[in-house]
């Protein structure tokens, strides 16, 4: 027994000595957790002058529906409407306090009630990520973000009070990702891999993550930012590679059974540029995206099937579009805001061989599920007034969104609706009461 006690004492002494030596090499260890809850209660009242395409409870607004004339000559989509909702109420938690030498860890968990299950609002995950930061390399910072967070193409938002925050003129997406950044001086380089979850690319089976899952290539983003006290400039690009078919769903050419592996693939790149200026109570920003596809970013786009001669290797072309916005905000207690957005469909970069057909078959186009294949261009203006009384905000916003539609059955060899062009307008008025926690 005495021998065991002596051995234990010797081991304890060795551990204490090694721990003391180790503590001399580590500058600081801090395991204190700091939890900072945040969020807001938000109630919205909305008037629309006509039926429109919008997300849950008509809060996330996209565009007015095209005219649909009945036998009496009336437009059945001309239906003014009014509604109220509070499902965008949000809860979040910031976690900080873990530091180990020059290495620190923080995190975020955020959710809202913007998920309708029948007529019941349910909790929906928005963000859940961990940030790893190394900050003791002279003026250079290195960071890694892992988890679900804002897509880098979407992170810079226009100044407005609506739920869609500029979409579909501004990308809107948060997804699981691993994003690395390195900052030296005023410059930051960012790159990483992204996987679609809530905001999905489209294809023959509708919106699905499977086009990336079975394609074995993650979505990739890379960008560079320059920041000063009053100015921010950012350029970046999103790359996504899809397999519209990874196996056959039917017997092909009489020789290939159901489940035969296919070589289909389409890869698309969407570059982006962003500018922001801040001076006192005045803020202004602008963004433009030249999107190939872009439907997973809630932009009006997709791609088209162009050739099926090889039953195991269908050919596709991306639909190109240009989407931009400019916005401003002035004031603190009494705040004036405004956004102007414009989108133009540019079609395919190459002409499609139509063969004996006169126009492209719309069934061969895989398009954003909340848009329409015969859109030529869109525009939006949203003047906004807000009064901020401490944590309480009263806001009212007017939204005028216009869409130029064309004949869906007259798509040319670039997939553009060239006939019967006409503009449809919707006038939306939104009132918001918001209380920040």
Predicted regions span which residues?
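Positively charged n-region of N-terminal signal peptides that target proteins for export
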Residues: 1-4
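C-terminal segment of classical bacterial N-terminal signal peptides
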Residues: 13-22
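Outer membrane beta-barrel
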Residues: 26-57, 68-69, 74-199, 214-217, ...
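Transmembrane beta-barrel architecture of outer-membrane proteins
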Residues: 34, 85-90, 124-127, 173-177, ...
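Outer-membrane beta-barrel proteins
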Residues: 48-52, 118-121, 155-158, 198-203, ...
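Extracellular loop and loop/strand-boundary signature of outer-membrane beta-barrel proteins
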Residues: 76-79, 114-116, 161-166, 202-210, ...
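Detector for outer-membrane/organellar transmembrane beta-barrel domains
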Residues: 227-375, 379
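Outer-membrane beta-barrel "beta-signal"
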Residues: 421-437
């Amino acid at each position: 027994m005495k021998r065991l006690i002596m051995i234990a004492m010797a081991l304890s002494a060795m551990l204490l000595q090694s721990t003391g030596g180790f503590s001399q090499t580590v500058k600081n260890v801090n395991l204190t957790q700091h939890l900072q809850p945040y969020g807001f209660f938000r109630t919205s009242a909305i008037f629309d002058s006509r039926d429109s395409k919008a997300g849950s409870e008509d809060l996330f607004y996209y565009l007015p529906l095209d005219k649909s004339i009945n036998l009496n000559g009336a437009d059945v989509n001309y239906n003014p409407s009014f509604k109220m909702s509070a499902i965008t109420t949000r809860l979040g938690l910031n976690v900080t306090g873990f530091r180990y030498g020059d290495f620190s860890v923080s995190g975020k968990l955020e959710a809202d009630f913007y998920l309708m299950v029948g007529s019941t609002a349910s909790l929906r995950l928005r963000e859940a990520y961990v940030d790893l930061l190394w900050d003791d390399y002279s003026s250079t910072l290195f960071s890694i973000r892992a988890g679900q967070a804002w897509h880098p193409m979407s992170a810079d938002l226009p100044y407005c009070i609506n739920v869609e925050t500029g979409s579909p003129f501004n990308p809107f997406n948060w997804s699981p990702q691993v994003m690395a950044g390195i900052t030296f001086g005023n410059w930051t380089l960012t790159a990483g891999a992204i996987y679609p979850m809530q905001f999905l690319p489209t294809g023959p089976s509708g919106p699905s993550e499977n086009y990336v899952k079975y394609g074995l290539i993650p979505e990739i983003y890379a960008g560079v930012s320059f920041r000063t006290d009053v100015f921010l400039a950012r350029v970046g690009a999103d790359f996504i590679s899809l397999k519209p078919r990874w196996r056959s769903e039917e017997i092909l050419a009489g020789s290939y059974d159901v489940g035969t592996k296919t070589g289909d693939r389409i890869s698309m790149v969407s570059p982006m540029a962003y500018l922001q200026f801040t001076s006192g109570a005045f803020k202004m920003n602008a963004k433009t995206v030249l999107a190939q596809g872009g439907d997973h970013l809630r932009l009006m786009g997709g791609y088209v099937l162009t050739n099926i001669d090889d039953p195991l290797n269908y050919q596709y072309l991306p639909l190109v579009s240009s989407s931009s916005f400019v916005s401003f905000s002035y004031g603190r207690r009494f705040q004036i805001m405004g956004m102007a957005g414009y989108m133009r469909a540019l079609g395919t970069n190459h002409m499609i061989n139509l063969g004996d057909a006169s126009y492209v078959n719309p069934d061969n186009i895989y398009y954003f599920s909340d848009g329409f294949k015969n859109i030529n261009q869109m525009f939006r203006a949203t003047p906004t007034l807000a009064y901020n009384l401490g944590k309480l905000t009263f806001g009212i916003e007017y939204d005028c969104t216009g869409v130029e539609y064309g004949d869906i059955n007259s798509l040319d060899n670039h997939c553009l609706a060239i006939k019967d062009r006409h503009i449809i307008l919707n006038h939306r008025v939104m009132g918001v009461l918001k209380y920040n926690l």
